[in-house]
Amino acid sequence: MGAVGAGEGGGGVAAGIVVEGVRRSFGSVAAVRDVSFVARPGVVTALVGPNGSGKTTLLLMLATLLRPDAGSIRIEGIDPVAQPAAVRPLLGWMPDALGSWANLTVRSALEITHRLYGHSRPASAARAVELIALVGLGELADRPTRVLSRGQKQKLSLARALANDPRVLLLDEPASGLDPVARIELRELLLRLAGEGRTILISSHVLSELDEVATDAVYLDHGVTASQEAVAAARASSRLWRVKSLDGFALGPALEGIGVDPVRIASDSQGFTVSMTDEADAAAVLAALVAGGTRVSWFAPASGELERTLQGLAGSGGGIR
């Protein structure tokens, strides 16, 4: 997965999102201190960081809802500070929580959203039908939005973000409240939208799901984007792999016999986590186990790449710079 952190925000790139040296404070609190990155068209870019790292403030600036104190932002080559009215039709913004106009039906809410972009009533009615089918709210189309569950309101919020067929999507925790099937459907939809050439920037605390959909990643901590060097160093650090065997307790001695010091997984008496320096090291351990007759039933990283990299950045001791 590519990292698109500080130092990669120039080069005359017009399409997608380009952010350079952006800062934003609220009084004495610096929410975003120094953010630079590029989000490319045609791929999903993950926005990753702990609580309080500045993700939501950054998304609000990209959505033209906050002005940066310093730095520059370009959405499809347009400055959202100087030309917000030109940028907004290009954007689809899905916040973590958004009011759903409780007394309107799902259909009416989508029709009104579409009409706000200047479309005719017939065009908005047709677009609402498309959006309802796209997010799977057909059975609820003529029900008031107040009866929707949390997950159903998320689907409605996504549909509203897509109302004007945007080139750039900004999604803050889009899978929150969705059931497992709906999460899979969301992942497939995002990949399809990216495949159509859209720029998608998505923030989520569920890193395993981001791993499955994101091609690039932006890492934030205390309002600062991680440098390419910091991300590379974090990825180069050792990684835990989970190993299981059909041979039960024989796995421990087998690992020790090839020079590996296993740490038993408390919740699984037959499994171990093993620290590997890289994939070549992991491949060598697996080959040695199989050659020694161990019947390996599971051999995989204990965490996804995003989680591993974020942990490596947090454990570097000097911040993420």
Go through each PLM region and give its residues.
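Helix-to-loop junction immediately C-terminal to a conserved catalytic motif
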Residues: 63
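Conserved ABC transporter NBD signature motif
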Residues: 71-79, 86-87
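Conserved ABC ATPase "signature" region
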Residues: 111, 115, 122-140
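Conserved ABC ATPase signature
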Residues: 144-148
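Catalytic Walker B motif of ABC-type/P-loop ATPase nucleotide-binding domains
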Residues: 169-173
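ABC transporter nucleotide-binding domain
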Residues: 186-274
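Short, charged/small-residue-rich alpha-helical element at the C-terminal edge
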Residues: 239-313, 321
